[in-house]
Amino acid sequence: MTIHCITPNPAIDVTYTVDTVVLQKVNRVREVAHRPGGKGVNVARLADAHGSAPVATYGFLGGTEGVLFKELLDQLAPGIDQRWTEAEAQTRRTIAVVDSADTTMLNESGAPVPQSLWEQLIANLTAHLASKDWVTISGSLPPQTDPTIFADIVAAIHDAGARVLIDTSGPALWAAARAGADILTPNRD
């Protein structure tokens, strides 16, 4: 059995630590941290750390940010098989500004993903699926993505005899539910 983790809209998570955020002033950053992010990547890292089954990741990465993302994930979890689909657009970033009292998040929305790249992702995924495998699809969709793409992915997974867990919200969650996803974990994000 292999655990396949799809992150539709991955991001490099950047955390800036400051003493105190003062609006409309220069804030000196004490510490900067970069890590590969996205709900599906977090699932993959946890599954890899558990060590009970091989883990593979899928999604869309592009540009120099995509290269950095792969390097960061390799450093944190070298056992994960990275099977990303290459996109033209830069991989997005999320920014967290942390001080002693609060955290402020700035999340880029990411770039639209053409249908042809979704088809590549599905072909890449199904080429690696076996009947006892599990697939997780976790997180938000890139902008302008038809939420019924999750129904297409669920159907392809079931056609291969594998099972699927969906962790998302809104119309994408409903599309996956109507397509017969095996497990749904609705969320508000």
Label each region the model flagged.
Residues 28-90:
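Substrate-binding N-lobe of the ribokinase-like
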Residues 5-8, 59-60, 85-87, 96-98, ...:
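Short beta-strand segments
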Residues 1-24:
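Positively charged, low-complexity intrinsically disordered leader regions
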Residues 3, 55-57, 164:
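Hydrophobic/aromatic residues located in beta-strands of well-ordered beta-sheets
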Residues 134-189:
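Conserved beta-alpha-beta core of the PfkB/ribokinase-like small-molecule kinase fold
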